Amino acid sequence: MTLLVALLSLTAACGGAESDMSATQADDGPTKRVALWGAEGGFVTATMNVLRPPRAVLYSDGLVIVDASKQLKLTDAETGETVASMETYLTGQPPTAEPKPGAPMVTDVPTTVLGVRGKDGKMLEVRAPALDQVADFYPKELSEAKKLMDGLATRAAAAGTDYVATRVRMVAEGAASAEGKPAPWPAGVPEPSGMVDPIWQKDIEGAAVSAIIKAVPAGQEHGRSLFKTSSGALFVLSWRYLLPDE
């Protein structure tokens, strides 16, 4: 009887240990953004506004994705250094920075977005309107943060590999007055439905991804992606790969 109790206790202890390990692994969760550089707004088309990805985004596992088209893997040390530097540059900055008095007025240009995940686990983002045009009127830390992320983007463009994903964001923009001969709507790709004002967007996966990539190859000019739906409506069809956390 004493031996049986001991065996039961050991079994329960082992089961408890296994449960604790599973819980720990579940809490780790997927990789998260830890640093980013992107843009918002500006004088761009509705399609570009929806499809525009971060210029460069760094994930907790060291993966760098640039323009949702190129990727590069950093070492743990490089990832940690990048996050630490971005945190130094952005800590204490307001959510929306303003240039010093005397800065020239600049309109219709994108707002630069810089971000880093702090030690508290929260994403700190700073927006700087027209940073490229009036950098001298902003704190130098913002330009340094952008320079750091720009360096990652340059590395990925030169030595990275193509980024692909199993999920795609597609956008159909109404083109009733477009010139040129439209192609039939690609089989397997969802047709726009409901309100289109002025665009219709949908995230797709599976066979639809292969179908849209075949119909509109990556990098193809929008002027060559004119399609007619089964109802006769004309649309310009565009897409990009979704990022891991989208």
Give the ranges of each region predicted by the language model.
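Sec-dependent N-terminal signal peptides
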Residues: M1-L7
